[in-house]
Structures are given as structure tokens and as C-alpha cells.
């Protein structure tokens, strides 16, 4: 990491066994995750003995998809907590124990709003280069007055890293568009990539239309899918670095060679220390 970035960032029985396996598949399938396990016991059948010898090697074994995930197929009560009627859906996931501590309507369809930006960030980190300079297009304009932007302008030159900071800290919708065009060439192509990658993560109850989350009827997800996406994001150290910042100063270059600075503050009250 360059010194410049450091300066700009501020931190703060056989049958019985077979049934058990089938049930495991049902649970995993209900959680938008899939895995196939096969178990059988053989006694003296040459064909099965050959199969065991030739095909039971580690080369042919794969880790079940949900092995490292928190999985639940139904609501999970939390001792001492009564479901809040105002909640559309909620989940509390213990990543260390890989368990769902609380789950309420985990698989109900909901509109993700700005949590959409998690998927945008995930793809930027997966396919982009942080030091790449991104040229901003006219697509970043036209947002309504009450829709959050970082102040990007057509022709501006911004590093992908800075766009990620604006996206994740301030929830800048313009940064989401700039990232989408950088990765895929257009918002529409990026939305297709978002949907492909969401399915790879097991988020099969999700469909994206844009990179920022501004409401569209065909743009939706579930609480559990959001967990899957966020869980994928936090495997990346840069993602964790950015969301831990208390502020960041973006640099935007113009056609004349001038550089403009823009401080972005988190819209997350936890990051700002305004709540506990």
C-alpha cells in the first residue's frame, strides 16, 4: 500500500445413515446451497469393491458446498428475544460455530436497497485492479437529489480503490455505476454478471438489475442470500480494511490534469461511533 493511501485513510445403520444424508441435502437445498453425498455399504461384491478401490481416492472427493456456511431451513428462535413485527426478515449468524443463532423469514423475498453494493464490491475486488484508473462517464449523472452520490463527474479519473471507498463508506450510487461500467462495460452487462456470481455463491433467491440498489421491482434478494454475499466479501482483506475506516479522502482527476479531493464519511452509524 502506498504511503499516500496510508496518509489519506483514517481508521478506528446403513439405511439410517443414508436417511441422515438425504436430510442433510434437504436442509442444504432449503438454504440455497447444494451438495451431493453418497453412502453405501458393500459386502463381497467384486464390482463395488473395484469401484471403492479405483474411485474413492481423494482426487474424486469434493468439499460439500455448505461445509463452511451457516445453514438453517426454517426460523430459529433466539432466547430472550421476541420477533419484532416491524422486521421484514432478520438473521444472526455465528461464523465461528457456523450456525444460525437467529433466523426470521430468512428466505422471504425482499428489496435489498443499498446492501446491493456488497455484490458490486465483491465483483470489483474479484475482477478489478485496485490501482486501475477509471474514467467516469455521463452515466454517473441524473440521480435524484435524495439519492446519495460522491460527486463524480463525466471525464473524471478515479482509482478503483477510491471508487470502492466511496461505494462502501458513503454508499455512493455514482461510484456503483462507475464500477459497473469499468468491470463489464455497462450497467446491464454488470447486472448479468452479478446474477451469475450470486448463483455461484448459492444466492439463488436473488436477482439484480443495477449495481446500487435503487428500487426496481425485479431487483430483489433474501436475508439469507445477503449473508452469503457478505460472507464472501469478508474473505477479502481489502473489503475489511475499507469498511473499518472512519473516513477516506478520494482523489478525482480532471482532463486538465488537476486533482480534486473529496472526503467521504461512512453512512453507517456504527463506523462513525454514533451507536453501539
Indicate residue ranges for each PLM-predicted region.
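Intrinsically disordered, low-complexity segments enriched in small/polar residues
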Residues: 14, 78-79, 153, 255, ...
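Membrane-interface motif at the C-terminal end of an N-terminal transmembrane signal
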Residues: 31-45
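Secondary-structure junction/capping motif
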Residues: 2, 159, 186, 266-267
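N-terminal Lys/Arg-rich, disordered targeting/topogenic segments
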Residues: 1-18
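Hydrophobic membrane-insertion alpha-helices, especially the h-region
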Residues: 20-33
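Active-site-adjacent loops and short helices of periplasmic peptidoglycan-processing enzymes
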Residues: 41-224, 228, 233-237
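Domain-terminus/edge residues, biased toward the C-terminal soluble/receptor-binding domains
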Residues: 203-204, 217-220, 224-276
Amino acid at each position: 500500500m502506498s504511503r499516500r493511501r496510508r496518509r489519506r485513510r483514517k481508521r478506528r445403520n446403513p439405511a439410517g445413515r443414508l436417511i441422515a444424508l438425504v436430510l442433510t441435502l434437504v436442509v442444504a437445498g432449503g438454504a440455497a446451497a447444494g451438495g451431493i453425498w453418497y453412502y453405501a455399504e458393500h459386502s463381497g461384491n467384486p464390482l463395488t469393491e473395484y469401484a471403492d478401490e479405483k474411485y474413492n481416492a481423494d482426487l474424486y472427493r469434493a468439499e460439500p458446498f455448505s461445509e463452511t456456511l451457516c445453514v438453517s431451513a426454517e426460523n430459529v428462535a433466539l432466547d430472550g428475544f421476541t420477533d419484532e413485527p416491524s422486521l421484514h426478515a432478520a438473521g444472526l449468524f455465528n461464523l465461528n460455530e457456523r450456525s444460525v443463532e437467529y433466523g426470521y423469514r430468512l428466505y422471504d423475498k425482499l428489496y435489498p436497497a443499498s446492501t446491493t453494493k456488497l455484490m458490486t464490491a465483491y465483483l470489483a475486488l474479484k475482477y478489478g485492479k485496485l490501482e486501475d484508473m477509471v474514467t467516469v462517464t455521463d452515466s454517473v449523472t441524473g440521480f435524484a437529489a435524495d439519492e446519495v452520490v460522491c460527486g463524480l463527474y463525466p471525464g473524471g479519473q478515479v482509482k478503483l480503490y477510491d471508487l470502492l471507498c466511496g461505494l462502501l463508506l458513503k454508499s455512493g450510487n455514482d461510484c456503483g455505476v462507475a464500477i459497473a461500467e469499468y468491470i463489464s462495460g455497462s450497467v446491464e452487462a454488470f447486472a448479468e454478471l452479478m446474477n451469475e456470481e450470486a448463483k455461484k455463491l448459492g444466492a439463488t433467491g436473488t436477482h439484480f438489475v443495477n449495481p446500487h440498489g435503487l428500487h426496481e421491482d425485479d431487483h430483489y434478494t433474501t436475508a439469507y442470500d445477503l449473508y452469503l454475499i457478505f460472507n464472501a466479501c469478508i474473505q477479502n482483506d481489502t473489503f475489511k480494511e475499507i469498511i473499518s475506516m472512519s473516513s477516506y479522502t478520494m482523489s478525482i482527476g480532471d482532463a486538465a490534469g488537476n486533482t480534486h479531493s473529496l472526503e467521504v464519511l461512512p453512512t453507517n452509524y456504527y463506523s462513525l461511533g454514533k451507536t453501539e
